[in-house]
């Protein structure tokens, strides 16, 4: 016999992205504050000797409980097809060192499921970074959606685990980790293609790059010479040229080649004021 029933749409079965109640749970001022304080979402987490192992759930306990109750109430009355799942497409961590490159130490960062007592990495979603490798960007991609359930006394969800190894003699902060992600909640779940954890080493920022340009160097030195205010020492019958312009122009600094057809007045373009690290 052919199926005679009706099929509810995805919204009715509630991936619940458009539900006002769920929006209030996820984006209330209290929920946003807890995401920052309990989960370090978008905040810098300092790795210190007294905090050698850090476990950061991707959903605060209070928020987890409210979301689970929302789905359970809908499930109990037959409006939802499950008690809810948590989906995280990607977790991105920016890692920077706060000690010298000579410091011998490393970080082990991985994604875990709080439903696992051993807190083992999910599908090999684990990256190790030596101190001299930093800075770096790390990414994780779970291969399944996590049920919104309680296991023992633990609210089950994904978590970022960071372990600090080595750094003998360094008791303060040796590295800073800033993690970002976007958790989604639905009454339906799926499995996903396995993608290995990503590790991208980043070139350190060259904050002196602007000062290495010839025109910038000349401008900087000229401004410094012109701003010097000191006592004047005069020799008998000798006039002192107090204009520092001639001194700065004698520096062995090559100006950029002039454009074809430009007039001699265009030579001053090479010495236009430029911003050099805020100067």
UniProtKB/Swiss-Prot annotation:
Any one GO biological process: transport of virus in host, cell to cell
Subcellular location(s) per record: Host cell junction, Host plasmodesma
Composition skew (Low complexity), residue ranges: 254-268
Superkingdom of the source species: Viruses
Database matches in InterPro entries: MPV
Transmembrane segments: none
Pfam entry (one): 3A
Keyword field: Host cell junction, Transport, Viral movement protein
Region (Disordered): 247-279
Assigned GO CC terms: host cell plasmodesma
Similarity annotation: Belongs to the cucumovirus movement protein family.
Function (record text): Transports viral genome to neighboring plant cells directly through plasmosdesmata, without any budding. The movement protein allows efficient cell to cell propagation, by bypassing the host cell wall barrier. Acts by forming a tubular structure at the host plasmodesmata, enlarging it enough to allow free passage of virion capsids.
Listed name of the protein: Movement protein
Lineage of source species: Viruses, Riboviria, Orthornavirae, Kitrinoviricota, Alsuviricetes
């Amino acid at each position: 016999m052919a199926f005679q029933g009706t099929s509810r749409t995805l919204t009715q079965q509630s991936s619940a992205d458009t539900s006002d109640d769920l929006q209030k749970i996820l984006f209330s001022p209290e929920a946003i504050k807890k995401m920052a304080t309990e989960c370090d979402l978008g905040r810098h987490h300092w790795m210190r000797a007294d905090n050698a192992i850090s476990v950061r759930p991707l959903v605060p306990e209070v928020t987890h409980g409210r979301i689970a109750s929302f789905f359970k109430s809908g499930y109990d009355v037959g409006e939802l097809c499950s008690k809810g799942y948590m989906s995280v497409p990607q977790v991105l961590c920016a890692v920077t060192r706060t000690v010298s490159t000579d410091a011998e130490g490393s970080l082990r960062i991985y994604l875990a499921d709080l439903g696992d007592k051993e807190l083992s990495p999910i599908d090999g979603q684990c990256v190790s970074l030596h101190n001299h490798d930093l800075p770096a960007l790390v990414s994780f991609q779970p291969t399944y959606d996590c049920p919104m359930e309680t296991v023992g006394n633990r609210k089950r969800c994904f978590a970022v685990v960071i372990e600090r190894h080595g750094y003998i003699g360094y008791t303060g902060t040796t590295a800073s980790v800033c993690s970002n992600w976007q958790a989604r909640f639905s009454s339906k779940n799926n499995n996903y293609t396995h993608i290995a954890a990503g590790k991208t080493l980043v070139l350190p920022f060259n904050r002196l790059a602007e000062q290495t340009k010839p025109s910038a160097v000349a401008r900087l030195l000229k401004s410094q010479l012109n701003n010097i205010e000191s006592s004047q020492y005069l020799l008998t019958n000798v006039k002192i040229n107090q204009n520092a312009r001639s001194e700065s122009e004698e520096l062995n600094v090559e100006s950029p080649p002039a454009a074809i057809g430009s007039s001699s007045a265009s030579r001053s373009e090479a010495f236009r004021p430029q911003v050099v690290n805020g100067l």
